[in-house]
Amino acid sequence: MPKMKSHRGACKRFKVTGSGKVKREKMNASHILEKKSRKRKRNLHQSTLVDASQEKTVKRMILA
């Protein structure tokens, strides 16, 4: 059987941390920013962790 291919889109969006958790960037931070408050925009540029219920699925996609 051939090797499994990783999901290239997922590989660009997710990174696995040293402890094995999956890190992601927040959405809604790239355009249409005028109406969003400074505080909201600042918080959108902080990375966050993938929810525990989705972690197994994401790891399978990126073959980590």
Curated annotation (Swiss-Prot):
The keyword Ribonucleoprotein applies. GO terms for molecular function: structural constituent of ribosome. It holds the Pfam family Ribosomal_L35p. Gene3D superfamilies: 4.10.410.60. One of its GO terms (biological process) is translation. It comes from the Bacteria. Keywords: Ribonucleoprotein, Ribosomal protein. Transmembrane segments: none annotated. GO terms for cellular component: cytosolic large ribosomal subunit. Belongs to the bacterial ribosomal protein bL35 family. PANTHER family: 54S RIBOSOMAL PROTEIN BL35M (PTHR33343), LARGE RIBOSOMAL SUBUNIT PROTEIN BL35M (PTHR33343:SF1). This is Large ribosomal subunit protein bL35. It comes from Chloroherpeton thalassium (strain ATCC 35110 / GB-78).
